[in-house]
Every structure is written in C-alpha cells, then in structure tokens.
Design a protein with these regions (language model features):
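N-terminal Rossmann-like NAD(P)+-binding subdomain of aldehyde/semialdehyde dehydrogenases
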Residues: 1-144, 314
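Short, flexible loop/turn motifs enriched in small residues
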Residues: 11-16, 153-154, 166-169, 369-371
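Conserved C-terminal structural/oligomerization subdomain of aldehyde/semialdehyde dehydrogenase
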Residues: 23-36, 58-75, 207-209, 278-279, ...
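Structural signal for hydrophobic packing residues in well-ordered secondary-structure cores
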Residues: 52, 56-59, 67-78, 99, ...
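Rossmann-like NAD(P) dinucleotide-binding subdomain of oxidoreductase/dehydrogenase enzymes
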Residues: 129-279, 453-455
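ALDH superfamily catalytic-core signature
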Residues: 204, 229, 237-381
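A generic structural motif
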Residues: 213-216, 253-254, 319-329, 421, ...
Length: 474
C-alpha cells in the first residue's frame, strides 16, 4: 500500500497525520496520504520565488522538450510515486478504486492529460498567438512588427485546489511549467493520483523539483493556498464560482451547464444527431462540465427526449474493470441519495416529464457506494427549474423553447453546440456573453480543441501585458 507524502518544493515530508484512501466498493484501504496543515504551506511560501527562478534558468524550448518527455513517462512509464514505484496499470487501478470511475475512463483521461502535455508547444503557440516564449522569460521583447511588447508575471507559482471527482481537469494547470511558473497544488483526497504521478513525470523528465509543491490536507490548506497565492484556481460548485466571482487572483471552475441547440432549419432532422447527443450526455459518465445537460429545440422535443431515454435508460451498473462500464460510482453514498432526492423534486414540477421512468430504478445502492443511472427529463418550457440543472451523472433535460427566445433563456453555458445554418442565430450566439466555447455544427460538447482557450486563457491569467519603453542613455 502506497503512502503519499507532502512535497515541499520537491522534497517529500513525512507527516505524522495520515488519511486512508479506501476502495469505493469494498471499503478496503488502498493508500495513505500524509496530511499537513495550512501553517506549513504558509511557511513554505517564502520559497515560492525560487520556483519561478529555477524555471527561468531553463530556456522555454528546453522546457517544452521536457514536457514531451514527461508526457511519455506519465502515460507509459514506471514512476516513483510516494514510497513506491507505480506502473501505468497501478495508476489506473488506484484511480478507479478511489474515484469510482470505470478503468477505461481512467485510461482515457490519462491519455488526454498526456496528449495536452505532449502537444504543449502547439497549445502555447495558439494561446499566445505565436508569441516568442522567451519574451515571458525576459519580460519584454520584439513581437516582430517593430513593436516592443512586455508581459509581467503576476505570481511565481500557480496554486490549485484540485477536485476529487474528475481527472480530466488537470489539463488546465499543466501549461504553468513551460510558462516558467511553479506549481503549488492541494490534491483531492480521492484523486491524488494524477497530480502525484504528473509531478513524478515532470521531475523524471528534468523539471526541477524546486518548482513543484504538493500539500494534501483539510480545508485550511485550500484556504491558505487561495489567500497566499497571487494566482490560483479552484474547482467546485456553482456556489464556489459565485464566491470568487470578480476576484482577479482566483480562477474558479464549476458546473458547465453545456447545451445543444437545434435551429428551426435543422430540428426536423434531429434523428441525424442522436449519436452526437448521446455522446455529449453520456461520455465520462456525465461527470464533466463539458457534458451536455440541456438540449433545446422549438419542436420535436418529446420525440428527442423519448429517443434519448430509449438509448440511455437501459444503461445499468457494470464492474469498473468491464470495458463496457458507462457509469461511475458515487464514492459517498449519501451524495448519491441526496442528488437523487433533488432530481426527484425536479421531476415532480409542473411541465416536467421523466422520460426514463419506465426503465427501472435510477438509484442503485451498494454497501459502500451508490450509482445513479441516466435520467432524461422533458421540460415544456425554459421556465421549468429543471432546464437550469446539472448533476454529476448522465442527466439532461430536453427543453421546448422557441428559437427567438433561446439565446436569452439558456443562461450560463460553458460549451454550446449549435446545430444550425441560420446566420441570425449564429450571430446572436457569437455575441452572447453567456456562452464560453461555441461550436457551430455537429461537434459533441465533450470534444475539445486544445488549441482554443478553455474557461479563460491561462497565459492572460498568469501574465499581464504592460508598457515597456527603452531609450539609450546619452
């Protein structure tokens, strides 16, 4: 059984306080995490400037090559993790056992993280609009148009309070290292595997350990991190996002409320897009902010909801080792029962119909965990509260709404796939400040182009553009 220790700028620290990580289905311990408190993090912040300093000593081109090597090690290598050596299969088994995700989904998320790291040169070229990365090192330089540009680093480290439930979100903090900004992470208690393995891969690839810190612990650690770091990110609920709204130091990531919109010019051919809808709702067991939670159309909505229910309603629980397993467990059974209670309340509202009611019980309870099978609801109006809901399992509402009202009614939407060729609808969505990622045409909401920014551009978050003038001394 592995013991994971805090990393104090690359150096393991053996804590006297350990927390067990248990198997979601058996309750058996699979690892121990040595917890620390916020006081240690606060004390160690005095070394944060060194994290950026050691990265600035390495040319960006070399950092990008080391990222490629780290990507290969992360996906294929045996790495020192905690007090043991972790193989790829060990990683997959451990992550599945503690998060409840089927093993094939863990493998898929692993490949996604590796892909982003291996293609970091292309991703940063896109996010910086082709800027020479040496300008970030020096702080200024020529952009190529005879214009001096300057970018001021806003923090020597990027802090991140990481989640328990979704290994895919780790792609968001990976660019910090090649941008010569250190990492200060609070790993999730149920999903410490990705940050620890990634840290090991980085260091094995030649990234200085002094640039990476890991502080497992309670809420005080997360709060200290967010208070002390000049730039940090946190993953949580809609309330978390609201709490940090307007705080320029914190990038808060929450529910996506991602949607598929049918234009009136396409909706009569809705059957052509059934597979797209199923994938958008069901991929990664519906756990991601990029999963579709709402399908909006002016007509055929009950037919669409019925077809989705017929596809997803029969999906049942399978063992996590099964390559056909489509549902992730709620490792906290009370969270599943609480979520199901909220869903039941939504389904009882006027104008709402449970389209999966005829496909058996949705809540599946086990001794140590629980599952929620897919739910498809039909809402005859965007005013139904269910039209604005998102849950951590395959759940979607099919909403009847006129095309002219859609853009004003959909609300906050991380990913919007618009199935239309109507120039007016496309222009309205393009101008909407409520839509982040916009897909025009048949692109599932869960398929991201990593050459595009996701929930903001990390380079703009870590670096501020400023004036920088130089004149020769007489």
């Amino acid at each position: 059984m592995l013991t994971l220790s805090a990393l104090r700028w690359g150096k393991p620290y053996k804590s006297l306080e350990a927390q067990e990580v248990v198997h979601f289905d058996t309750g058996e311990p699979i690892a121990k995490i040595g917890n620390v408190n916020g006081g240690m993090l606060q004390l160690d912040m005095k070394h944060a400037p060194r994290a950026r300093a050691v990265l600035r000593e390495i040319p960006p081109s070399d950092l990008l090559e080391r990222c490629k090597k780290a990507a290969d090690l992360f996906e294929n290598g045996d790495l020192p993790v905690g007090d043991g050596i972790q193989s790829v299969d060990d990683f997959i088994h451990q992550q599945s056992a503690s998060t409840g995700l089927p093993e094939h989904m863990c493998r898929s998320n692993m490949k996604k993280n590796s892909f982003v790291l291996a293609n970091m040169d292309k991703i940063l070229a896109a996010l910086t609009r082709g800027l020479d990365l040496n300008i970030f090192t020096r702080g200024h330089g020529e952009e190529g148009r005879g214009v001096t540009v300057s970018y001021q680093c806003q923090s020597p480290v990027l802090g991140a309070v990481l989640p328990n439930n979704s290994p895919g979100v780790h792609t968001l903090w990976l660019p910090a290292i090649p941008l010569q900004v250190g990492l200060l992470l609070k790993p999730g208690s149920q999903e410490p595997w990705t940050p620890y393995r990634m840290a090991a891969a980085f260091m094995a690839a030649g990234i200085p350990g002094e640039a990476i810190a890991m502080y497992p612990g309670g809420h005080d650690v997360g709060q200290t991190l967010l208070t002390r770091c000049q730039r940090s990110m946190i993953f949580g609920s809609a309330q978390t996002v609201e709490q940090y709204a307007g705080n320029p130091r914190v990038q808060a990531h929450g529910p996506g409320f991602s949607k598929i919109l049918f234009g009136d010019d396409v909706v009569d051919r809705w059957e052509d897009y059934l597979e797209l809808m199923v994938e958008s709702i069901f991929s990664n067991s519906g756990r991601s902010c990029i999963n579709c939670s709402g399908i909006w159309a002016s007509r055929h909505t009950e037919e669409i909801a019925k077809a989705l229910a017929e596809r997803l309603g029969p999906v049942d629980v399978l063992p996590p080792q099964d390559s056909n397993a489509g549902l992730a467990a709620f490792t906290n059974a009370k969270m599943a029962t609480g979520t199901w209670g909220m869903v039941q309340q939504d389904l009882q509202d006027s104008g709402v119909k449970d389209m999966t009611a005829g496909f058996g019980e949705r809540l599946v309870e086990r001794p140590y965990c629980a599952y929620l099978r897919p739910v498809i609801a039909h809402a005859n109006s965007p005013e139904c509260p269910v039209a604005a809901k998102e849950y951590m399992f395959p759940f979607a509402s099919v909403v009847k709404c006129s095309q002219k009202e859609m853009v004003n009614k959909i609300g906050s939407t991380l990913v919007c796939t618009a199935l239309t060729s109507d120039p007016q609808l496309i222009d309205a969505l393009t101008e909407s400040v409520h839509v982040d990622r916009l897909n025009i045409g048949p692109i599932p909401t869960n398929r991201l182009n990593w050459l595009q920014p996701h929930e903001g551009n990390l380079t703009d978050f870590l670096y501020r553009s400023r004036a920088y003038q130089i004149a020769a001394l007489g």
